[in-house]
Structure formats: C-alpha cells, structure tokens
C-alpha cells in the first residue's frame, strides 16, 4: 500500500487505452466505459483526478510525418488534435455518468474546450471535478509525456501515473525484444536518465525531477487505476532515496 496519503494525482493515459485494436473502431465503447468507471472509483476515494490523454489510437504525429511525407510541425499538430477528440469523448462519457469535469485544451479551441489555465484547473480539482487536459504540451516536437509532466508540475500533484498498454513498468532493456529484460521496482530520476531508458520521454523525467514529483509507470492492461494509485505495481521513478510508493 502507499506510504503516504495521496490527495491529487495526474494520469497520463495512452490513446491506445481507448481502442480495441480494430482500425475501424478508434474509440471502443468497452474501453471507454472501463476508463470512466475506474476514474469514478479513484475520485470516490477522495482523490483529486487530472488526466492527460494521448491520441495514438487516432493518429501519431511522428509516424504520420514519416509515412505520408507531412512536415513534422503539421503532423504533430494533427496528433494534438487527436488528443482533443479523445478528450471530448471522455468528457461526454463522464457527463453521462454525472461526474463533474472540466475539458481543457492547451491551444485555443473555445467552441470545443476551455483554454487550459493552471489556476482554474487547480480550482476545478479542489471542487471535485475531473480535469481533462488535451493538446499535449501545445507545441510540436514535444511528447504527451512532456505535456503530462508540465501539467503535473503546474497542478502540484502528488504523483504522475503513466498508464501503458504494452509493458508493466521500466525495464533495463526492451522486454518486447529481450526475454531476459529485468523490471525495476524503483529507479532514481538520475539513473533513468544516465541509462538512456526509453520508456518515458527524458524531458518529462527532468521536469518531474526538478519539481520532486514521483512518476509511476504501470500496465493498464493488467492493473486498474485504483491499483495504480494505492498499491505497489509497476515502476516508481523518484529521488534516489524515494523507494517504491
């Protein structure tokens, strides 16, 4: 169990968490329903919940840039728009379940979402609203991991939880390629960076290191959001003396 009371968290949710893998079904009703149900459980445990949603189920900016010969800036902006589509789906599903929420966008889209403002978002969290952050960091060449780290720092969360669909933490090698890869229960920010581990954008690690915000990376395919918040799962990245949360 967690050693300290967690009051405010930020989930970084992969866009793939909303897809069932069917190329014609970018947002799965079953996957969306599961995510909404699990967000409700965490919120009902008196935890303030913010989340940054990816857009990989719809479009990945870098891969589109390479495969379609679209320039990188445009491709990344298209990827940011994909996160807004996912955020709108989440907000509407939360509304259907009578869960108060605030849909925000890093870039101005006044007819679709409220322009992200750290103080307004923090106030909304204090009021019990789920805050959905879309459009990543709001600039090309920056990943949604970095966007999530920025939001985590601005909102002063207790922990950033990165949910993935493929691996259950940070390994010394890519477990999808190396059968003998070893998973870390805990690794320090500096060791993560010095070893060049690729599970999380190093810019995101650096931001959280400066702010002293631990990161937990876990498998959303294996664990619920509640387990990620309250139990010892996945890998924690924190200060050298931080240990597993």
UniProtKB/Swiss-Prot annotation:
The record's listing under Pfam families reads: AA_kinase (PF00696)
Kindly list the places in or outside the cell where this protein is found, as annotated in its UniProt entry. Cytoplasm
**Protein residues bound to UMP:** 55, 76, 137-144
Question: What are the protein's UniProt keywords?
Answer: ATP-binding, Cytoplasm, Kinase, Nucleotide-binding, Pyrimidine biosynthesis, Transferase
Q: Does the keyword ATP-binding apply?
A: yes
Tell me which Gene Ontology terms the entry assigns under biological process.
Answer: 'de novo' CTP biosynthetic process; UDP biosynthetic process
Reactions it catalyzes: UMP + ATP = UDP + ADP
GO CC terms in record? cytoplasm
E.C. number(s) listed in UniProt: 2.7.4.22
Q: In which pathway does it act?
A: Pyrimidine metabolism; CTP biosynthesis via de novo pathway; UDP from UMP (UMPK route): step 1/1
Quote the record's binding site residues for ATP: 12-15, 56, 60, 164, 171, 174
A molecular function annotated in GO for this UniProt entry is: ATP binding
Activity modulation: Inhibited by UTP.
Query: Broadest EC class?
Result: transferase
Q: NCBIfam families of this UniProt entry?
A: pyrH_bact
As for family, the record states:
Belongs to the UMP kinase family.
Q: Briefly, what is this protein's role?
A: Catalyzes the reversible phosphorylation of UMP to UDP.
HAMAP family in the record, alphabetically?
PyrH_B
Subunit composition and interactions: Homohexamer.
Put simply, this protein is called Uridylate kinase
This chain is encoded by the gene named: pyrH
